[in-house]
Design a protein with these regions (language model features):
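Hydrophobic residues in well-ordered beta-strands that form the structural core
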Residues: 95-96, 120-122, 235, 260
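Contiguous beta-strand/loop segments that form the cofactor/metal-binding neighborhood of enzyme cores
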Residues: 186-266, 295-310, 346-347
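Beta-loop-alpha module in the N-terminal Rossmann-like domain of NAD(P)-dependent dehydrogenases
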Residues: 52-112
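Active-site loop of classical SDR/Rossmann-like NAD(P)-dependent oxidoreductases
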Residues: 36, 242, 286-299, 314
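Predominantly a Rossmann-like dinucleotide-binding segment in NAD(P)-dependent oxidoreductases
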Residues: 126-214, 336
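N-terminal Rossmann-like dinucleotide-binding module
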Residues: 1-49
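C-terminal helix-rich "cap/oligomerization" subdomain common to oxidoreductases
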Residues: 28, 69-72, 228, 300-347
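Rossmann-fold dehydrogenase core element
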Residues: 108-125, 145-150
Length: 347
């Protein structure tokens, strides 16, 4: 038996991908699932190829002494309370974003994790993709020089044809275009540009197509970020486009630029200004959770737990920072004004 025994909370689309990724790794195995829907333990065990106990009561599952960690894949409105319950029970936590739907929920979740001393992995999994490991390598090697501008944009038409649409579109669970989905683009921009955000401005709009009329919040937002060190960034979160899924990346530095899978650098001999070099990686080009780099992320998480360390890249501190910028951006378009990050940090 693998070392860490994991219980999954919620049994939907994301949960299936979490179970497969955890079980495919070398350090953990899913042994329990808690769901509001009745589940047959024998059928679930056969489907996932390992013994799984089922629960309808989260407290009962968390009380089990042979449970080391939980993976929260429930509706967004439940994340904060379930995360706090798991932390207080002494369980390490994997949680789908968001940590909370607003600043108050974020602070409650953050404080509970810190007070309990458990380790946490937040599913900003794009940081662990081969694409952004390659991009970060180009940045860290200095091939772009000093970055001064970046844009990372999320284009994914989420309409009635999409499985999660009935609850994604609600203000209760979806909350905003940026928090629901564009958060991955914001998280990657912050990873690539580094430094502290000083101020954000954000604008909202939405499609006239009737397919997207069900959204209870603007389905497109564009956010401009001003960093304390002078860098500028932009994130578009577009849920009402009619096109293939597209995760756009453009970074500009003093010695070169990177555009999706291409980059140019003045520091590479033999290149002229009209030539791109090409990066080799598996791109983020699908919304299917089965294609997300969960296995890499979860392996890194359980490695960190073994060492008694905080997870790198997608631990608590990084996730809180991304949420803070998102909440500033959402406040900016709602109040039609620039928002200083200091307003969020001192709230």
């Amino acid at each position: 038996m693998k070392r860490f025994k994991v219980g999954v909370v919620g049994y939907g689309w994301a949960a299936g991908a979490h179970i497969a990724a955890i079980n495919a790794g070398s350090r953990a195995q899913v042994t329990k699932v808690c769901s509001s829907r009745p589940l047959d333990a024998a059928e679930l065990s056969a489907r996932h190829g390992c013994p799984i106990q089922t629960y309808s009561d989260l407290a009962a599952m968390l009380a089990e002494p042979d449970l080391d960690a939980v993976s929260i894949c429930s509706y967004h409105r439940h994340h904060k309370d379930q995360l706090i319950a798991a932390a207080r029970a002494g369980k390490h936590v994997i949680v789908e974003k968001p940590l909370g739907r607003n600043l108050g929920e974020l602070r409650e979740a953050e404080q509970a994790v810190r007070a309990a001393g458990v380790k946490i992995c937040v599913c900003f999994e794009a940081r662990h993709s081969t694409q952004f490991r390659a991009v970060k390598s180009v940045i860290d090697r200095g091939l772009l020089g000093r970055l001064h501008y970046g844009e990372v944009d999320y284009y994914h038409g989420i309409g009635p044809w999409y499985g999660g649409f009935p609850w994604y579109r609600t203000a209760r669970d979806g909350v905003s275009s940026l928090l629901l989905a564009g958060c991955h683009a914001m998280d990657i921009l912050l990873l690539c540009l580094g430094g502290d955000v000083e101020e954000v401005s954000s604008y909202s709009t939405q499609s006239a197509n009737a397919a997207f009329a069900g959204y209870e919040y603007p389905s497109t937002t564009v956010t401009l970020l001003k960093f304390k060190d002078g860098k500028v960034g932009k994130v578009a979160s577009v849920l009402d486009c009619l096109q293939p899924y597209y995760f756009h990346t453009h970074l500009v530095g003093s010695e070169g630029s990177l555009l999706d899978d291409k980059f140019h650098s003045n520091l590479i001999d033999g290149l002229n200004r009209n030539q791109w070099s090409t990066l080799s990686y598996r791109p983020i080009d699908s919304s299917d959770v089965a294609d997300h780099p969960y296995q890499e992320q979860f392996e890194r998480f359980f490695e960190a737990v073994e060492r008694g360390e905080e997870m790198r890249l997608s631990g608590l501190a990084e996730a809180v920072r991304t949420h803070e910028v998102i909440f500033a951006a959402d406040r900016a378009w709602k109040e039609n004004r620039p928002v200083k990050l200091a307003e969020i940090l001192t709230a």
